[in-house]
Amino acid sequence: MSDFIVGLTGGIASGKSALAAEFEKLGIPVIDADVVARQVVEPGPILDAIAHRFGRAILLPDGMLDRQALRQIVFADPVQRKALEAITHPAIRAELRRAALAARGPYAIVAIPLLAEAGGRATYPWLDRILVVDIPAALQHARLMRRDGATPELANRMIAAQATRDQREAIADDIVSNDRTPEQLEQEARRLDVVYRVAASEH
């Protein structure tokens, strides 16, 4: 049981996954919001609610979610997107918390890419600490073009669609700057691991 929970977030291409992997090497369970988001729309009550709201055309013949069909509906219409989020987001948050509390370790990390956009602690009041991975804008831009093959214009749009660095840092208890070597990122994870283990033991 891990009742001390750290929220991990950062902008696109900031290195959230790399930092999460360093904590996993230290034996810390990491629950990924992207994975949970895919799990909650597997056949079951949440998918039933989505089909009821958007119609059975968003289901594949085998009863699974047709992600492309749903994506075309919600990305074209902000009202539809909010309707989908009203169904899925509470279920995702509840499952993240359940999985974190059930995890075996001195504490658990929940990786939430859009934590700042979702409202930070106001939306996730059960987070004991928030860790933000920060990256200079120029390096983030270069990584996006290299990693995703994005054009400079697309990279700019992808970054602009997310919270600003200031907005993320405003919700942070801890900030790791990921403009260094993998070895330095590992050292930062080890340093914070000590901090979190102590905090969890006193929790």
UniProtKB/Swiss-Prot annotation:
Domain of life of the source: Bacteria
BP-aspect Gene Ontology terms: coenzyme A biosynthetic process
The protein's name in its UniProt record: Dephospho-CoA kinase
Biological classification of the source: Bacteria, Pseudomonadati, Pseudomonadota, Gammaproteobacteria, Lysobacterales
Principal cellular location given in the protein's record: cytoplasm
Known role: Catalyzes the phosphorylation of the 3'-hydroxyl group of dephosphocoenzyme A to form coenzyme A.
Family annotation (CDD domains): DPCK
Enzyme Commission (EC) number: 2.7.1.24
Subcellular location: Cytoplasm
UniProt-listed PANTHER family: BIFUNCTIONAL COENZYME A SYNTHASE-RELATED (PTHR10695:SF46), DEPHOSPHO-COA KINASE-RELATED (PTHR10695)
Keywords carried by this UniProt record: ATP-binding, Coenzyme A biosynthesis, Cytoplasm, Kinase, Nucleotide-binding, Transferase
MF terms (GO), sorted A to Z: ATP binding; dephospho-CoA kinase activity
Pathway: Cofactor biosynthesis; coenzyme A biosynthesis; CoA from (R)-pantothenate: step 5/5
InterPro entries, A to Z: Depp_CoAkinase, P-loop_NTPase
HAMAP family: Dephospho_CoA_kinase
Reaction it catalyzes: 3'-dephospho-CoA + ATP = ADP + CoA + H(+)
Record-listed ATP binding positions: A13, S14, G15, K16, S17, A18
Coiled coil: none
Family statement drawn from the similarity comment of this UniProt entry: Belongs to the CoaE family.
Organism per entry: Xanthomonas euvesicatoria pv. vesicatoria (strain 85-10) (Xanthomonas campestris pv. vesicatoria)
Pfam families the UniProt entry points to: CoaE
A GO cellular-component term linked to this record: cytoplasm
Top EC class for this record: transferase
Domain (DPCK): residue spans on this chain: 5-203
